[in-house]
Curated annotation (Swiss-Prot):
One of its GO terms (cellular component) is cytosol. It comes from Streptococcus thermophilus (strain ATCC BAA-250 / LMG 18311). It comes from the Bacteria. This is Ribosome maturation factor RimP. GO terms for biological process: ribosomal small subunit assembly; translation. PANTHER family: RIBOSOME MATURATION FACTOR RIMP (PTHR33867:SF1). Pfam families: DUF150_C (PF17384), RimP_N (PF02576). Signal peptide: none annotated. The keyword Cytoplasm applies. Transmembrane segments: none annotated. SUPFAM superfamilies: YhbC-like, C-terminal domain, YhbC-like, N-terminal domain.
C-alpha cells in the first residue's frame, strides 16, 4: 500500500473517532473520505437521515463538525483541506454489516477482492444477508442467476440505480 493511502486511512480513522460520537440523532454517519482532487484536499463527511437530508441539515452539521476537527492534536492534516458535508446520494456506500442488512431488497453493486466464477463485480438485487453471506440475484446476459458471496471477499458495496 502506498504511503499516501496509509496516511489518508489514518486521517479517516482519526476523524471518524472524533466526529461519529458528535453526530446527533436522527442523523447517521455514512462515510468519511479524504482525497486529493487536482491540487486540493477534500474531507467529505457523508451524512444521512430517514427521509434524506436538506441543505440546512448540512449547514447545521458543518457547524458541529468543523470546530471538532480543529481540536485534533497534533493536526493530522498535512495540507489545507476543504470540508464537505453532504448526502451520500443515490449510490450510497454500504460499508458495514448493518448497512448491508438494511439494504436487503434493494439493487446493489458489489466489487470483490477475488472473482467468483470469473466475475469480480456483481450488480443485482440483494435477496439476503445473514451477517456472513450476501445472496444476490443478478442478470447474466438474459438469465437471472443467484450468487452467494462471502462477506470477507467484498472489497466495496454500494446501492446502485437500476436502469
Amino acid at each position: 500500500m502506498c504511503k499516501e493511502v496509509i496516511m489518508s486511512q489514518k486521517i479517516i480513522d482519526l476523524v471518524t473517532a472524533v466526529v461519529a460520537p458528535a453526530i446527533p440523532d436522527p442523523y447517521e454517519l455514512v462515510d468519511i473520505e479524504y482525497e486529493k482532487i487536482g491540487s486540493d484536499y477534500i474531507l467529505s463527511v457523508l451524512i444521512d437521515k430517514p427521509g434524506g437530508i436538506t441543505v440546512e441539515d448540512t449547514a447545521d452539521l458543518t457547524e458541529i463538525i468543523s470546530p471538532l476537527l480543529d481540536t485534533i492534536q497534533p493536526d493530522p492534516f498535512p495540507d489545507q483541506y476543504m470540508l464537505e458535508v453532504s448526502s451520500p446520494g443515490l449510490e450510497r456506500p454500504l460499508k458495514t454489516k448493518e448497512a448491508l442488512k438494511n439494504a436487503v431488497g434493494q439493487y446493489i453493486n458489489v466489487s470483490l477482492y477475488k472473482a467468483i466464477d470469473k466475475i469480480k463485480i456483481f450488480q443485482g438485487d440483494l435477496l439476503a444477508f445473514d451477517g456472513e453471506t450476501l445472496t444476490i440475484d443478478y442478470l447474466d446476459k438474459t438469465r437471472h442467476k443467484t450468487v452467494e458471496i462471502p462477506y470477507q471477499t467484498v472489497a466495496k458495496a454500494r446501492l446502485a440505480v437500476k436502469l
